[in-house]
Amino acid sequence: MAKKIIISNELRKFRFFANEMTQQQLAEKVGVSRQTIISIEAGKYSPSLELAFRIAEAFGVKINELFDYEVKETNR
């Protein structure tokens, strides 16, 4: 059996609680494009470790409060 890692995040929730920060505002704060933030929120793109830390720092939280991962076994 193969293992698949699924990374989930709470970006949308943290943006909402940060005075409804826009995707553009977060993107500018961490130095990426708005499209990158959209892709991360949608689970289509997993950020680099460095970017994940920059995003967590932007919200003043630890990385594990913002990102989580799950290992699933697949029948490959």
List where the protein language model places each region:
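Residues within the helices of the helix-turn-helix
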Residues: 12-13, 24, 53
